[in-house]
Each structure stands twice: as C-alpha cells, then as structure tokens.
Amino acid sequence: MSDAAKLAHLASEMLERGVRRVHVLAWRDLDDDEAGGSENHADEFMRRWQEAGLSVMHRTSFATGRPEVDSRNGYDVVRRGGRMSVFPRVALSETFRRMGSYDALVEIWNGVPWLSPIWCRKPRILILHHIHGPMWEQMFPRPVAAIGRAIETRLAPPVYRRTPTVTTSTDTHEELLHLGWRPDLVTTGPVGVDEFFSPGGEKTAHPSVLAVGRQAPVKRFVQLMEQVAIARTTIPDATLTLVGDGPERKVIREWIERHDAHWVTLAGRVDREELRDHYRRSWLIASASLAEGWGLALTEAAGCGTPAVATDISGHRCSVLHDSTGLLAPLPELGTVIARVLADRGLRDRLASSALARARELTWEALAVGVLEPLHAQVTRPSGGRRNR
C-alpha cells in the first residue's frame, strides 16, 4: 500500500469514528517572517491530512501583515495573540470552544509547552522537534533562560509522559526517554524532501559553499564564516553564500566588513526557484548550527545533488548520514572538513550521489502518515482515546 493510500485509510477510519475536526497548535505560522523548518513540517502534514478528508484548523500567533483568519493549502489558519500571550489565549479558547468544536488535537511544542494534557479531553498527540538546551542562553537573558530550561526539562515533562509524542530526531527520542517519556509512546520519523528540489544546471566554476537559514544566534553564521575563512587558507578561491535573514544580519554584515570578506555574499530572502538554483550551483551546503530538530535545508540540497558538511549535533545526525550523504564534525574542525570536500572531486561526487539517492527516499507523504498514526491509535483504541489523559 502506498503512503497516500495509508493516509487515506487512516483518515477514513477516524472519520468513521466521528473524528473529523483536528486543531493543530503551533507557536508560529508558515507565513511568519521568522518561520523555519518546524513551520514547513507542519504545513506539509496539515495539507495532506486535509486532502485525505480531515478538517484541519491551524491555531497560531499573530503574523505581521497577515489576516487573523486565513486559509492555506486547503486548511484554515487562525492567527491571534502575541508570541507569549498566544499560549494562555489558545488554552482558554479551546477549553470554552471559542474556536468552534474539535475532535482531536495536535500540539507542536517549540520551547514553550501548551500544556494540553491539563485542559484537553480529546484524542491528542505532541510534536517535539528538539530539546532547546543551550539555545535558551542564546535567546534570552540568564534568569529567563533558566526558567525556560526548568520548564522544558523539569516542570513540563511530568505532564506529558503519557502523551504520544512524535519527533524527527533519534537523539531527541533518547532525550525524551531520559526525561521520563514512555518508550512505547515516542515515535521518530524523518521529514520529507519535495520533488521540486531536484538536480539541474551546472555547478559554479569556483569552489562554492552555501548556508541557508534564519540568521539567528543558534545558527552560528559568524562561526561558519570563520570556519570557511580557515578553509580558504588551502582553497583560496572558495566563496560562501548566505541565504536568509534575521536578527543576526547586522552582526554578520559587521563581521564581513571588519574582515574585508569579499568572498561572502548575503543573498537575503529568496523565492523557491532561487533557492533551488543556489542548491544546484553550490559545491556543498554547510551548517554550523548549535541545535536542530532536523536540518531541512541539508536534505533539500541533497535532493539537488549537493552534499553537506555540518556540525555533529542532534538533528544533523539524522539529516546527514556521516561519510555517506555528507560529513559531520565538531565546530572547530568544520573549516578543515569543508576544505577537504572542496579539494576532493571524487569524495564530493560520492557524497553527492548518496545524498541524492537518500533524498529520493524521503517523502512528505510518509511523514504525514507517521504523524497521523499515533493520533489514529488514540481515536481507535477501545478506551476511546482517554489513555493519554
């Protein structure tokens, strides 16, 4: 049975049991200026659930320049509340049915939990891409960071330990078990790669490195530039292109000016076609991130036949298969590894071939099935879906 057929079957069985309206809670919406891989992940499974016959509402926070009530790819989007106020606002709205009745709930926990086990008495699941850990100190002042860490690792886990949980990273899977989640309630599945991201065109005539992502502290773009500068001591004509925007853009610009780094290009935000062109032309894609749930740009680049060099962290270990689809290394060694890949055509071709083959195995249809299966299990179990409450 194909993944599309599996998805239709699961949705049909849920509909037969009266479960049609599914609310999906997320901190940010795909149309938010700061949207990233988590938001893309949510859009991919929601659109497919909608196509399979479920009625999906995406509840999220306000996005600048976007209407409060909207629709995208067939499902409804409601954007109300600020970055922090959205959490209590949604809990109250769902408790008192201000957003209408619903039959099942999906909570996407991105640092701050929605605490749905406390107020939701419907079949529900949790999606958690990664534990933020050291990211708290990068995003907030120390007292606030300490509170965030405590909520994420000590206060919230006991509330969720009986909640079916989906993650994309095997490392996050292990972290959840360490925090007390039941092994039988945690599932792990890879993200997909859109068929749009495919090989084509010619590589640049000179050694070229690409980095894609929101320019935030956790992505460590300044450290990546430092590592590419190290690579340039042996590959002097190597260049680096940074695609994306964000709060660190000024810091990045200042570094470029201070080091007269004419070899760095800031491409800014680009559309889908331009992004694919960057993937296709570059010799390799690199990431110096401190933490990732997966690293979607790395597998999109793989779909275009471009291998990766990335930090050896949770998330990257799933998106990049070391010495197969790319190479993983500690941050201080990244420059040396980048230089090695740029200098060795045979190594680069081998990694590119494996990266492309694996990317073709990663589908969003399989992801949509993998996320729906635990919710389906809650709906169809004899207890009527009350086991996780």
Outline where the language-model segments fall:
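Nucleotide-activated donor-binding/catalytic signature segment of Leloir-type glycosyltransferases, i.e.
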Residues: 253-270
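Membrane-proximal helix-turn-helix segments that form the acceptor-binding/catalytic region
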Residues: 143-165
